[in-house]
Structure formats: C-alpha cells, structure tokens
C-alpha cells in the first residue's frame, strides 16, 4: 500500500536525520558500555528514554555555570516553573555535572584538553546509545582576548594550535596523530545572526587558539615559570592576531576535532575577560565578570529559542 503524504514526509525526514557516527567498531560488540566518569551505564540506564529527545547540547567548564545555564534556557523556553529543580544526572560522581531541560542538555567539562576530551568520549557515546539525531553542540565559555574589548564575544571560525595551525595533535600508541579542527560554517553564521538580533554586546568571528596551559602556554608573565620577556610575549600575541586569532582558551581544538569526526554540528562561543595585549591578570570586579559570563549563555539561549521557533 502506498504511503500517505504525512507518512511519506515522515519517512523523508527520517532519511534526512543525521545520527551520531562513532569511529570505533569495538563499541557495537560490547554487551555493556560503562560511562565511568558520568556514573552511567547502558545496562543500568535507559539512554533512549533519558536522552532520546535531546537536540541541543551545551558544554562549559564550570558545573555551577552549566546549572545556571539550564535554569536560564528552561525559563526562556517556557519549561520552568517556581520551585522546579534540575537534578545533576551525574550525581554519583564529582568529575562532571549534567542537567537536562526538554531538548537541551547542559554538561560541565572541567578545564583543559584532557578533561573535556574524556567528557566528550562519554558524552558522544551516550548520545549514540540514546539514538539521538540532528544534534547541535556548542561550547560556551570564557577566554582571553587579543586586541578586543573585555566582554566581547568571539564566535570561533577555526580552532588553531599554538603555532596557529588548524590541527589537533595527539599521541596514540606512541605515534603522532593529527586531525583537523573543522567547525560548522553555517552554524557560525546562524550564531552571528542571533548576536545581531540581540545587539547587546560586541561580537566578532575569529580564530580561537587552544593551548595546553594557562600560563607559559599562553605567553603569560605571571606564572611560577617564565623563560621569555614582555617583548617576546607581545611579538607572539601580535603574530597570533595577524594569523586571525582573536581569543585564547584550552578546549576548542579537541572539541572541534571530536565533534567533526562524529558528525556533530558544533560551534564555540566564548566571552573575553581581558585583552592579553594589555595584561595577564584578571582583576575585573566580580559582578562585571558574572555579567560577561552570561553573554554566551544569552546568545546561545536565543539561538535555541529561534531554532525551536520560540523567539
């Protein structure tokens, strides 16, 4: 019997769905997959029931910040009500925190490439086991700017390494493996439009340099170790700026690499807390920093509302 118009459309939409692509044939043969750092397992949790409706995943370093974000986005989407709580789904561990409101998942990733890398392995597998499709994942965070007014929001065009190359290098079984750091260009433009819609703060699109360290790795002069001069630092940061780098953080390269490899549409949106050409230490008043940190949340919250037709 021929399909009805509605059935045919549903079938077409199903064929157009973009599912998670694990680049690991071993997973399919496993009877149980323990996501140790989330305190979740395929044998003890029903992932499709828990996460099957997720369409937007937002990740950030701080667990408290991601808890604040889920409350904010829930209110924006009309999912909140007085007294509503958003329990930590990973409450059995203190490594990461995870919160959910409707189609939005909010997950903390800690600080630096190793921490976010571990989280992403388990998050991507979790979404795969939940049979999620058409996922958009966005890192929202803080960074140091280069030549930007503090409080500016940078939407990452390309994640680059300390030599300004769009590469992520990892040692695997004693060998160097280099992968690209591609992000979704269309998603960048959608976020740019959302920033224009809001028109609340300075925004730029630029490259984001991802480093392994907060101090020497970012050319700071105020760490316990420093083997270079102020002149050396300025020369390096100006070279980075000339290469299109507008901010510096410690997670974007592995985030871009892993999301791209697994078929996830991904973006990075970070606020700058200072201009590194002007100094190294963050001495902005606390209340100002809190407002700065809300800027990526407001931008991404508006993007989610707009994507769901609720803006």
Swiss-Prot record:
This enzyme catalyses: uridine + phosphate = alpha-D-ribose 1-phosphate + uracil; 2'-deoxyuridine + phosphate = 2-deoxy-alpha-D-ribose 1-phosphate + uracil
State the pathway, as annotated in the record.
Answer: Pyrimidine metabolism; UMP biosynthesis via salvage pathway; uracil from uridine (phosphorylase route): step 1/1
**Enzyme type, top EC level:** transferase
Chain residues that bind phosphate: 61, 95, 139-142
Biological process annotations from GO:
cellular response to glucose starvation; CMP catabolic process; dCMP catabolic process; dTMP catabolic process; dUMP catabolic process; pyrimidine nucleotide metabolic process; UMP catabolic process; UMP salvage
Keyword Cell inner membrane appears in the UniProt entry:
no
What switches its activity on or off, per the activity regulation note? Strongly inhibited by 2,2'-anhydro-5-ethyluridine, a competitive inhibitor.
Q: Which family does it belong to?
A: Belongs to the PNP/UDP phosphorylase family.
UniProt-listed Enzyme Commission number(s): 2.4.2.3
- The gene name on file is Upp1
Q: GO molecular-function annotation terms?
A: deoxyuridine phosphorylase activity; identical protein binding; thymidine phosphorylase activity; uridine phosphorylase activity
- When the coding gene is removed by deletion, what phenotypic consequences does the entry describe? Homozygous knockout mice are completely viable and show no changes in growth, development, sexual maturation, and fertility. There are no significant histological alterations present in the major organs including brain, lung, heart, liver, spleen, gut, and kidney. However, uridine concentration increases by more than 6-fold in the plasma and in tissues and 24-fold in urine. Moreover, pyrimidine nucleotide metabolism is more generally disturbed. An effect on thymidine metabolism is not reproducibly observed.
Report the NCBIfam families cross-referenced here: euk_UDPppase (TIGR01719)
What InterPro entries does its record include? Answer: Nucleoside_phosphorylase_CS, Nucleoside_phosphorylase_d, Nucleoside_phosphorylase_sf, Uridine_phosphorylase_euk
Record-level GO cellular component terms? cytosol; nucleoplasm
Q: Which UniProt keywords apply?
A: Glycosyltransferase, Transferase
The species this protein belongs to is Mus musculus (Mouse)
Any idea what job this protein has? Catalyzes the reversible phosphorylytic cleavage of uridine to uracil and ribose-1-phosphate which can then be utilized as carbon and energy sources or in the rescue of pyrimidine bases for nucleotide synthesis. Shows broad substrate specificity and can also accept deoxyuridine and other analogous compounds.
Induction trigger: By a mixture of inflammatory cytokines: TNF-alpha, IL-1 and interferon gamma.
One Pfam family matching this protein: PNP_UDP_1
Quote the PTM field: The N-terminus is blocked.
The name of this protein is Uridine phosphorylase 1
Q: Where does uridine bind?
A: 143-144, 218-220
């Amino acid at each position: 019997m021929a399909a009805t118009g509605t059935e045919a459309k549903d079938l077409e939409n199903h064929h157009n769905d973009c599912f998670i692509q694990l680049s690991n044939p071993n997973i399919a043969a496993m009877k149980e997959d323990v996501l140790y750092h989330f305190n979740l397992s395929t044998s003890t949790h029903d992932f499709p029931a828990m996460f099957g409706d997720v369409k937007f995943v937002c990740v950030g370093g701080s667990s408290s910040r991601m808890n604040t974000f889920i409350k904010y986005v829930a209110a924006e989407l009309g999912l909140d009500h007085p007294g509503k709580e958003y329990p930590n789904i990973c409450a059995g561990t203190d490594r990461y925190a995870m919160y959910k409101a409707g189609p939005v998942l909010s997950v903390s990733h800690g600080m630096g490439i190793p921490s976010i890398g571990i989280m992403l392995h388990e998050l991507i597998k979790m979404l795969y086991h939940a049979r999620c499709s058409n996922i958009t994942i966005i890192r929202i965070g803080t960074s140091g700017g280069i030549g930007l007014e503090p409080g500016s929001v940078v939407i990452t065009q390309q994640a680059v390494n300390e030599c300004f190359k769009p590469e992520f290098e990892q040692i695997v079984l004693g060998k160097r493996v280099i992968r690209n750091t591609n992000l979704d260009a269309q998603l960048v433009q959608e976020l740019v439009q959302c920033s224009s819609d809001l028109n609340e703060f300075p925004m730029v699109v630029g490259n984001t340099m991802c480093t392994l360290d907060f101090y020497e790795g970012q050319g700071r002069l105020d760490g316990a170790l420093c083997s270079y001069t102020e002149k050396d630092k300025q020369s390096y940061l100006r070279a980075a700026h000339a290469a299109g780098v507008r901010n510096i953080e410690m997670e974007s390269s592995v985030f871009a690499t892993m999301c791209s490899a697994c078929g996830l549409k991904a973006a990075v949106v970070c606020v700058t807390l200072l201009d590194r050409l002007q100094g190294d230490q963050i001495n902005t008043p606390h209340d100002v920093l809190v407002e700065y940190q809300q800027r990526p949340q407001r931008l991404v919250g508006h993007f989610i509302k707009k994507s769901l037709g609720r803006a």
